[in-house]
Structures are given as C-alpha cells and as structure tokens.
C-alpha cells in the first residue's frame, strides 16, 4: 500500500486485466472484492480494499498497474524494505504466499510500519473502520469493514478505543498476525505505541492475536514513562524499572 501511495495518484484509474482475474481464480479461498476483467476502479479504492479486507485481486491489479507484474512488484517491495532499514526481511512473493526464501521478523515489521505511518494518507486508511467503494462500470458499490478488530466497530470485545491501525492477516503457516498502533488514552501521557503480534493461535472462544495486542498496549501505556529531559541518575532508575516491567510482561504473555 505504501508503494502505491508513493508511486501513484490516488485518483488514477486502473483497468483490471484478464491476467489479474486468472491469477486470483488460481488462488482458491483468497480474499478478494470480486473484481472483473475490464473493470475500472481508482488506485485509492484498491488500496482501501487491500488494507481493510486483504483483497488480493486488488493487489494484483495495483502491482500490474505500477510495474507490470507481481514478480516485478515483489522486487520493488524488497528494495523498499531494505531502503528503510528492514535488513532481515526478504520478499519473494508480493501477495505473501509461502516460499522458503521469504521471511521477516517483528523488529523489521515494526520498522516498516513506523515508516508507513508517517504517510498521512496511509494513517487515514489504516484507521478506517468502514469504507464504501463507489459503483464501477462492472459492479455496484461495495461496503468494506476492517478485519482488524481493534478498529472494527462491530466487535466490542476487542475494539481498542485509541487504536489507529494497522493491518491484520492470516495464512495457514503464519497463523494470525497483527501490526497495530494506538495513541495513549486520554488519562495517560505518552506517545503512540506500535505492537507486532506473530503466529497467534486463535480459538472459537478467543482471538488471541487481538487479546495479546490489547495486553501489550495496555501494559505499555500503564508502565511506560518517557526518560527524555531527566537527569542521568533518574534515567538509570527508570531504566531499571523498565527491565522489571518487561520481565513481568513476559510472564503475562507466557
């Protein structure tokens, strides 16, 4: 999404090709917004559908629009990741499907998300609960709702009042994953907090990917204190407290 926002005018019109439809039809069970060959849709609408509901047909259409193919887009993603400091990330498939060579980690994903959240339009999209794609030449309007339950207003159990993004995802190998960001509650003084959850196992009773995210965010806002502006001895004292609280956090999550 960040590449599309940086490379394209959001109002540019993309015409969906036959090859995009063929690619998505070959991926059974993949999330999509059911694009059709010849459909004309804006870059912005494609980005919203990627971010809110993980629409892979939208990804395929954007990748082809920007650089001609998914393979070329994966190369572009790799170059972008390295350029912003994600040194331990290797991208081989633009759509995230498993290959033995493709990998990343929580630290690199945090670097990537921090960079993305400096883009105003990206922040707006990441924090969006509901979005309607206007009718196109091939389809009527489409109503989307964010699958990130920290944002989703239809889910009271996991909704986080100050959450402002970012992206949830799932594959059979990776399990449930979430990159999330939240502002401090009104009663707290602090900064925006970013958390990465990888490989969460969900059950019918509990979506642990969101439970863990809420646990991390609450713990951070309740225990974090900025050290800037304090004397060195105060900073050392606060650092010792931080080490202690991190240990407690590990106990909570284990």
Report each predicted region and the residues it spans.
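Domain-terminus/edge residues, biased toward the C-terminal soluble/receptor-binding domains
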Residues: 86-87, 98-103, 107-108, 113-254
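Active-site-adjacent loops and short helices of periplasmic peptidoglycan-processing enzymes
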Residues: 1-107, 116-120
């Amino acid at each position: 999404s960040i590449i599309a926002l940086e490379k394209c005018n959001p109002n540019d019109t993309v015409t969906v090709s036959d090859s995009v439809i063929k690619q998505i039809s070959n991926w059974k069970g993949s999330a999509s917004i059911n694009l059709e060959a010849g459909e004309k849709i804006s870059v912005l609408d494609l980005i919203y559908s990627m971010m809110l509901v993980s629409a892979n047909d939208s990804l395929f259409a954007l990748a082809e629009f920007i650089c001609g193919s998914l393979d070329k887009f994966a190369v572009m993603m790799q170059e972008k990741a390295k350029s912003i400091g994600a040194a331990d990330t290797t991208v081989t498939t633009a759509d995230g499907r498993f290959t033995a060579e493709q990998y990343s980690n929580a630290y690199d994903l945090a670097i990537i998300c921090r960079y993305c959240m400096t883009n105003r339009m990206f922040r707006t999209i990441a924090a969006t609960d509901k979005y309607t794609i206007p009718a196109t030449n091939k389809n009527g309007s489409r109503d989307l709702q964010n699958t990130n339950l920290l944002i989703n207003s239809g889910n009271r159990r996991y909704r986080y009042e100050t959450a402002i993004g970012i992206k949830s995802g799932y594959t059979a190998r990776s399990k449930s994953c979430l990159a999330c960001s939240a502002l401090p509650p009104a009663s707290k003084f602090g900064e925006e907090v970013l958390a990465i959850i990888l490989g969460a196992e969900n059950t019918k009773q509990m979506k642990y990917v969101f439970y863990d995210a809420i646990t991390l965010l609450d713990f951070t806002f309740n225990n974090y204190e900025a050290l800037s502006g304090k004397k060195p001895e105060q900073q050392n004292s606060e650092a010792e407290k931080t080490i202690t609280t991190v240990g407690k956090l590990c106990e909570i999550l284990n």
